Amino acid sequence: MKFLILNGPNVNLQRYSEPGMPGELDYNGMMDYVQSGCDQMGIETDVCQTNHEGDLIDEIQAAAGRVDGIVLNPGGYAHTSVAILDALRLCGVPAVEVLLTAPDEREPFR
């Protein structure tokens, strides 16, 4: 089984804290953490982070026939990109959106 783990704009600059774990992880630490869990489950991963909407769409389109699923953190595009949603619907690969914060608990414009 293979998943595309796709991260959008500014995700590479965020810091993460996991309940029960001391301190924070930077983006590379978080991806190492995710990779470790996937390795334990025998899941192969292809990880990509980009700040460009078109690159996210290109990765989604290229996923068809290449991966079994997509895990997407679209960053700020979660609220604004119809094009990313269209790409996900058209590519035929099961996908899940992962957000690190709840949009309804953030700024009103989101």
Name each model feature, range by range:
Residues E44-G54:
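Short beta->alpha junction loops
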Residues D55-E59, T80:
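Short acidic active-site motifs
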Residues Q14-N28:
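Glycine- and acidic-residue-enriched helix-capping/strand-helix junction motifs
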Residues M1-L4:
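Extreme N-terminal starter segment of soluble prokaryotic enzymes
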Residues Y77, V82-R110:
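Flexible, gly/pro- and Lys/Arg-enriched active-site loops
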Residues A63-I70:
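Short acidic/histidine-rich motifs immediately flanking catalytic phosphotransfer sites
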Residues L6-V11:
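N-terminal nucleotide-binding beta1-loop-alpha1 segment
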Residues C48, V71, V96-V98:
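Hydrophobic/aromatic beta-strand patches that form the interior of the parallel beta-sheet core
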